[in-house]
Amino acid sequence: MNNKAILRTLLRCAALLLVTVGAVAEPAVAAEAPAEEQTPFQIISEVSKLDLTPYAGKAVFLNFFTEWCPYCMEEMADIKKVFETYSPDDLQIILVHVWDGEDEKNTASIRKDHKLEELTFFEDEDMELARLVGLQGYPASLFFDKEGDLAFGANYALSYDDMAKQMDSMDVAKSELAK
C-alpha cells in the first residue's frame, strides 16, 4: 500500500471514530446562561474548582504564584498591604498557589513566612485554573470588578501602587483603619 492509500485509510478510520463517539456520547449539560452572557467571573466558577460566587458584588483580586518564583514572593508584602488597606466588605483577595512542582507544605510555609494567615488561598493542584486563564508565567494577577467582569490582568510582578491603582479604578472602599 502506498502512502496516499494509508493516509486515506487513517482519515476514514478517524472520521468513523468521531461519528461513532458523537453518536454515543451523552449530551452536555447546558450552562446556566449562554457563554456570551456570562462574566469571566461566572465562567471561572462554572468550569473550575474555584467557586467565586460567594464573592458576587465584591471586587476580586486573583494572584497566581509559586514558591520558587522570587518575584511572586516579593509581591506578598504588597498584597498583604492591599489586604490591610481595602475593605473586606468590598474586596476579596485569593492567592492561587499553582502546584508547579509544589504541594500544600509550600502554602503553609508561605502563609507563615509572609504572615498571610488571614488571606484566602486556593490550591491549584492540577494547574487547571492556570490553564483555564491561559497563565503564561509567574506571577500573574487578575482583577475582577464588582460586576464580575475582568478589569485588568498582568503577567508580571506588581507593586503596591500598581495594585492600589486597580483597586481605586474598581471603586474599592478603603478599610476603616486605612482611612
Task: Identify the role of each PLM range.
Residues M73-H114, E125-R131:
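Structural microenvironment flanking redox-active thiols in thiol-disulfide oxidoreductases
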Residues S175-K179:
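Non-globular targeting/processing and membrane-anchoring segments
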Residues D113-E117, E125-D168:
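Thiol/disulfide oxidoreductase modules built on the thioredoxin-like
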Residues E26-L52:
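N-terminal "domain-start" segment that seeds a small globular fold
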Residues A56-K58, P88, L116, L135:
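Active-site acidic short loop of glycosyltransferases
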